[in-house]
């Protein structure tokens, strides 16, 4: 497979994730030096989902975060564009509801969910605003969104160190543990091309979300973005 480019057909990107599905979680643990689990836990804490609430876990991968939500009594639907990820998730947790779906054309009715979360997947949605608009559509008025995504460390020396890690160590580590190391060339490219914290906040506003805010994790390597759908919003608002 050729080196991943950011303007690739979305189905090609999904195919790359199909290829890495079986060892996806292990690879994430290794490449993040174990931080991936902490970032996902922080995301769920920020979401604050309560037992009985209906939550959409978008770009759910193999369902790692969905499983934690379900174990806490949340009615969670796991949705991913990669059929390989969905199949692997069903194999691991057959009790969870997995759905294959495109974030820009979600297969759910307006106002279906109390909350939506997407972890490390918004970079893969093209265009991102269309995906955020769809997330708004399927969220009930007054509902909330939490996005965890790679971001830009605000302290320049740390940003330089992080960039050195991405360029020097990411691919060799991926080759050691991943079933498709070239997919992690795409990871590096997509991180470098992705907007910073304020840029993502602007995308959220453009899509119709309100109460937008963020906080940095691990020095800004990751940012947690939070937003709400205003209670008086028409459920059709925000369509892309």
Swiss-Prot record:
Keywords attached to this entry: Menaquinone biosynthesis, Methyltransferase, S-adenosyl-L-methionine, Transferase
Task: Name the source's superkingdom.
Answer: Bacteria
- InterPro entries, per this entry? SAM-dependent_MTases_sf, UbiE/COQ5_MeTrFase, UbiE/COQ5_MeTrFase_CS
Residues that hold S-adenosyl-L-methionine according to the record: 62, 80, 102-103, 119
User: Is S-adenosyl-L-methionine tagged as a keyword?
Assistant: yes
| Pathway noted in the entry | Quinol/quinone metabolism; menaquinone biosynthesis; menaquinol from 1,4-dihydroxy-2-naphthoate: step 2/2
Q: What is its EC number?
A: 2.1.1.163
GO molecular function list: demethylmenaquinone methyltransferase activity
Q: Which Pfam families match?
A: Ubie_methyltran (PF01209)
Its top-level enzyme class, in one word, is transferase
Q: Which reaction does it catalyse?
A: a 2-demethylmenaquinol + S-adenosyl-L-methionine = a menaquinol + S-adenosyl-L-homocysteine + H(+)
Which BP terms from GO are recorded? menaquinone biosynthetic process; methylation
User: Which purpose does this protein serve, as stated in its record?
Assistant: Methyltransferase required for the conversion of demethylmenaquinol (DMKH2) to menaquinol (MKH2).
Which HAMAP family does this chain map to? Answer: MenG_UbiE_methyltr
| Family stated for the protein in its record | Belongs to the class I-like SAM-binding methyltransferase superfamily. MenG/UbiE family.
Q: What name does this protein carry? A: Demethylmenaquinone methyltransferase
């Amino acid at each position: 497979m050729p080196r991943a480019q950011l303007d690739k057909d979305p189905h090609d990107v999904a195919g790359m994730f199909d290829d890495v599905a079986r060892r996806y979680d292990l690879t994430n643990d290794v490449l993040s030096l174990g931080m991936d689990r902490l970032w996902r836990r922080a995301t769920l804490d920020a979401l604050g989902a309560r037992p009985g609430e209906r939550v959409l876990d978008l770009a759910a991968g193999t369902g790692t975060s969905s499983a934690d939500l379900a174990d806490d009594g949340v009615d969670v639907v796991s949705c991913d564009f990669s059929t390989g990820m969905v199949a692997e998730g069903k194999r691991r947790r057959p009790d969870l509801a997995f759905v294959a779906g495109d974030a820009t054309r979600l297969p759910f009715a307006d106002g279906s969910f109390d909350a939506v979360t997407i972890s490390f997947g918004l970079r893969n949605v093209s265009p991102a605003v269309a995906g955020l608009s769809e997330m708004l559509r399927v969220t009930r008025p007054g509902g909330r969104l939490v996005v965890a995504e790679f971001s830009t460390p605000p302290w320049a020396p740390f940003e330089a160190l992080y960039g050195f890690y991405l360029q020097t160590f990411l691919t060799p580590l991926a080759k050691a543990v991943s079933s498709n190391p070239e997919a992690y060339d795409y990871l590096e490219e997509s991180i470098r091309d992705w907007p910073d914290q304020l840029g993502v906040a602007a995308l959220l506003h453009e899509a119709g979300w309100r109460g937008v805010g963020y906080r940095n994790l691990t020095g800004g390597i990751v940012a947690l973005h939070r937003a709400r759908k205003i209670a008086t919003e028409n459920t059709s608002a925000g369509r892309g």
